[in-house]
Regions:
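N-terminal periplasmic/intermembrane-space "pro-region" immediately following the signal or transit peptide
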Residues: 1-47
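Residue-level signature of outer-membrane beta-barrel architecture
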Residues: 66-70, 114-116, 164, 198-200, ...
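Repeated loop/turn-to-beta-strand initiation elements of outer-membrane beta-barrel proteins
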Residues: 72-75, 119-122, 169-174, 202-208, ...
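Outer membrane beta-barrel transmembrane domains
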Residues: 210-217, 250, 255-258, 269-271, ...
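Transmembrane beta-barrel strands of outer-membrane/channel proteins
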Residues: 27-35, 77-81, 124-126, 174-178, ...
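Surface-exposed coil loops of outer-membrane beta-barrel proteins
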Residues: 36-58, 85-109, 116-199, 207-215, ...
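Surface-exposed beta-loop-beta
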Residues: 182-261
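Outer-membrane beta-barrel "beta-signal"
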Residues: 312-314, 318, 341-353
Length: 353
């Protein structure tokens, strides 16, 4: 039928069916009491950040968060406080007038991401480290405290990443970051992280992570760090889960030699019921050259350890966790109840709600 003269053509309204991004809010509090058998001076526990204090009630980690989740955009902003936060941001660089831990430690994460293709995301900001299985958030970990291996790899990084879902079973990431657990830069160089995850079967997951970057201040000769990590997780059935991690790092030094460290940890967890679980861990960490752990002793930090724990979850959003943990080192590096010399043995018990 002919359109009447002067009549405007009809336009069909096309409705956008893309769901709007959802915004959600959350909060978390992890309180604890820890007793270190070495009874360190000034209530400060050495060499681990969780728990960081001895013989006092305190907050390990508390945060509030806002999340954005959509088909094409995503993000998270979280503000935090706690003794683990103070311990982990103590090494934050303060170069210039707007850097340092005063601001950096308040921000747990602040990042935003966009989906650039059906299988590729690009994210940028401050975000949790892609190295390792163990989270900053104790609730998400099989053991209450992080292993030595995890404590001496980054909790967080600052930069940008590309995530590619290569297949339903394989995911790969590439990160460009400021450095090894820092928010502000300490030199003009950028560092790189790669991670590949493979869900081999419904019960077996494997991952590999690699890091490379200069970790020295701009005023000093470069020290390039190369780090490799292998991870495995097994859901064995009947309430059993197992985690295994091995890492090795090499750092160059100005005289053309290198320094090496390595670590290993194995964790097993058994769910006795829907509300009760037990967990055990064995671990070893060797940093003779004191790249990550400065002891000032001849053999550096060469330590084996273990822990046992009990988790009770009376309500959906409540966990009561208790853990007994011990260490044995080649050198006397642990507090010894106020004695003038330190001990090769260390340990503590911690309970958390």
């Amino acid at each position: 039928r002919e359109m009447p003269s002067g009549a405007a053509p009809r336009v069909l309204a096309v409705q956008d069916t893309t769901p709007k991004p959802a915004v959600s809010f959350g909060a978390f509090i992890d309180t604890y009491f820890a007793w270190d058998f070495g009874q360190p001076d000034a209530f400060h526990r050495p060499y681990t950040t969780q728990p960081a204090r001895h013989d006092e009630f305190n907050v390990n980690l508390a945060f509030i968060e806002a999340r954005l989740a959509g088909e094409k955009i995503r993000g998270r902003v979280a503000l935090q406080a706690g003794t683990s936060v103070q311990a982990n941001y103590a090494g934050e660089p303060s170069i210039g007038s707007v850097s340092g831990d005063d601001l950096a430690r308040i921000i747990q994460e602040a990042w935003v991401g966009v989906r650039v293709s059906p299988k590729v995301w690009v994210d940028g900001g401050i975000y949790f480290s892609p190295i390792g299985w163990e989270s900053f958030i104790s609730w998400d970990n099989p053991t209450y405290t992080r292993s030595l291996l995890a404590d001496y790899t980054p909790y967080f990084v600052t930069g940008a990443k590309v995530t590619w879902a290569a297949s339903p079973k394989v995911t790969a990431q590439l990160h460009v970051v400021n450095g090894w657990q820092i928010v502000s830069e300490n030199n003009p160089d950028k560092s790189f992280i790669a991670r590949v995850e493979w869900q081999a079967t419904a019960a077996l997951a494997l991952a590999y992570a690699f890091y490379a970057g200069n970790e020295q201040l701009d005023t000093l000769p470069a020290r390039t760090r190369y780090y490799n990590q292998l991870l495995a997780k097994v859901a064995a059935g009947h309430g059993w889960d197992f985690w295994g991690t091995f890492d090795v790092g090499v750092q160059t030094v100005p005289d053309a030699s290198s320094q090496t460290w390595y670590g290993v940890v194995a964790i097993g967890r058994k769910a006795l019921s829907k509300k009760v679980a037990v967990v055990g861990r064995v671990e070893g960490h060797s940093d003779r050259d004191q790249v990550l752990i400065l002891t000032g002793t001849p053999d550096g930090f060469r330590t084996i350890g273990g822990s046992i724990g009990v988790d009770v979850q009376p309500e959906e959003f409540v966990k009561w966790r208790t853990e007994l943990r011990g260490f044995s080192s080649s050198d006397p590096v642990w507090p010894d109840q106020g004695a003038p010399t330190e001990s090769e043995l260390g340990g503590f018990i911690v309970t958390s709600l």
